[in-house]
Each structure stands twice: as structure tokens, then as C-alpha cells.
Amino acid sequence: VRKSYIDPVTTYEVNVMGTINILEAIRNSNSVKSAIMVTTDKCYENNEWEWGYRETDPLGGHDPYSSSKGCAELLIKSYQKSFFNNPSKSPGVSSVRAGNVIGGGDFSKDRLIPDLYKSINQKSKLFLRNPFATRPWQHVLEPVSGYIRVAENLYNAGSKGNDSWNFGPHIADIKTVKEVSELFCASWGINQAIEFHSDADHPHEAQTL
């Protein structure tokens, strides 16, 4: 999200034009039977609600990253209606939306669990920007198992199965950044030095997802 403020043009090029390029490849293929388009839970117009967003809620987004994902969702919906609409011939195409997925192989910038591990390994303090921001944390195997089920259903149902799907934890399992940090450190049996601070000049980030 923060990188999209620095380079919004590339953000839109990748997430919007990248999506349309994939959709065009599917449209011009004779072999694709089903496809899932992975976007994000940030594609919704975020009103800082305490409850989860539904697949029918308005798309949008405050920051360029979220907005670009909303645009990608609109493209997918347009292609579903315009090109992937023949029940007997069209491939099944659906979007799937998940957020704050954690698991092995995650080396991206500004990721809580990798940053916690690095600070523990380097015996350095970890600075967290939004300790009380809540996120729908889930292990990568949870949404991936759902994605596979959606793909299987699309393969069998074709374009009749076209839709959009949210994947996330039960609302009772949603934790703040602070809670996840403390749970992670406790599981390692480590009293890690964590400092929480906010920056008035920091770009907007949603408190509740």
C-alpha cells in the first residue's frame, strides 16, 4: 500500500493493465476451462466497519493500491458479462479476495511476520506504525484451499459458476497488529522489544479491514 503512494502509475499499470492482459489471454485461448483472478480484500470502499465486507458491497479504495484493485475487479466483472457468458462454451472465471495472508516464502516489504522474525534474528527493535489496526490474518493454506475449490467448481460449471468470493477468518479470530506481534513473540518464548509509534506524515492506511 505504501509503495503505491510513491509510484501510483506503476501500481495502476501492474494491477489494471496486468489484469486486462490476463483476461485477454483467457479470452483468446481455446484450452482454458477455468480461471481464478486473485485480487485483495482492499478492493472495497473502506468505511472502517466493524463487520466483514460482502462480495456485493461497493468497490473503491482510498489509496492507489486499493483503488487499482477495485478497478481490476470491475474489469473482471465486465469480461464475465461481455465475453465469458456462454454457458456451453465460455470458461469459468471468478475473482477471489483475501487479505493479510501469512506463510512461508513471504519476503515482501512491510510484512508483519517477516519483520518480526528479522528483528528477533538481528536482536533489534521492531517499530510498528499501526498497532491497533485490525486485519483478517490467515495462513496461506486457508485461502489457497478455497481457491482450488472455486477453480474446481468453475471447471465443472463453466461460466455458470462465474462470481466473486471473499476468503477470511471468523470475525472472532481477527486480531490487531499488536496482538499478533505479542502472540508471535510469545510462541517463540521471546520478550521482543517492540515500539509502537504513529507518524503524522505517514500516508493513510485503513485501521479496519
Short names for language-model regions:
Residues 100, 120-209:
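C-terminal substrate-binding subdomain of Rossmann-fold SDR/epimerase-dehydratase oxidoreductases
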Residues 2, 9, 20, 110, ...:
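Residues in well-ordered alpha-helical elements
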Residues 22, 79, 115-120, 146-150:
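A short, amphipathic alpha-helix embedded in the catalytic core of nucleotide-handling enzymes
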Residues 68, 105-109, 173:
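Residue-level signature of the cytosolic catalytic core of signaling kinases
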Residues 55-57, 68-69, 93, 114-128, ...:
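C-terminal structured domain segments across diverse proteins
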Residues 47-50, 106-110, 140-141, 177-180:
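Short aromatic-enriched loop/helix-cap "lid" or pocket-rim segments at secondary-structure transitions
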Residues 1-98, 102, 182:
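N-terminal Rossmann-like NAD(P)+-binding domain of SDR-like oxidoreductases, especially those catalyzing
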